[in-house]
């Protein structure tokens, strides 16, 4: 693991990991954390290259973000977690669940688009170019 994630944590109980979309950070969930923390140990994570988490040297891909999440859960000694993802956060959650299903309690997905066949080519190219640009800027 070449990065240390920034995160906001509040509450007790089953872990609920909040995963933001591209270009956002953990503060995306600031209005939900208090309510969710009444029943869960809420952890809002800044993914690689977002918010206060450094870019690092590894690939800037959804698969890498899923592997980053595995490393984060291991460091936090969390064996299983509920995952709530918005946009690319939903993509990360889906990828993580596909690779590490034994580590997932529940998935809550909002606006994910892991199957790129439904994305117009022009839009997909813009997304890929933005990721490449972010990689070069780091």
State the predicted function of each range.
Residues 46, 82, 105-108:
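Residue in the alpha/beta-hydrolase core beta-strand immediately N-terminal to the catalytic nucleophile
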Residues 85-89, 93:
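Gly/Ala-rich beta-loop-alpha elbow adjacent to hydrolase catalytic centers
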Residues 63-81:
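Conserved acidic catalytic loop of the alpha/beta-hydrolase fold
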Residues 94-99, 105-135:
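Flexible "cap/lid" loop of the alpha/beta hydrolase fold
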């Amino acid at each position: 693991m070449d990065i240390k994630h920034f995160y906001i944590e509040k509450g007790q109980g089953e872990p609920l990991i909040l995963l933001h979309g591209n270009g956002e950070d953990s503060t995306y969930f600031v209005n939900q954390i208090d309510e969710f923390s009444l029943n869960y140990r809420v952890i809002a994570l800044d993914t690689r290259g977002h918010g206060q988490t450094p870019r690092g040297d590894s690939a800037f891909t959804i698969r890498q973000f899923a592997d980053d999440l595995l490393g984060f859960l291991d460091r936090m000694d969390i064996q299983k977690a509920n995952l709530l993802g918005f946009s690319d956060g939903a993509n990360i959650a889906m990828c993580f669940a596909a690779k590490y299903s034994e580590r997932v309690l529940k998935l809550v997905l909002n606006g994910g688009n892991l199957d790129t066949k439904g994305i117009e080519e022009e839009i997909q190219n813009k997304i890929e170019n933005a990721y490449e640009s972010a990689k070069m800027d780091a």
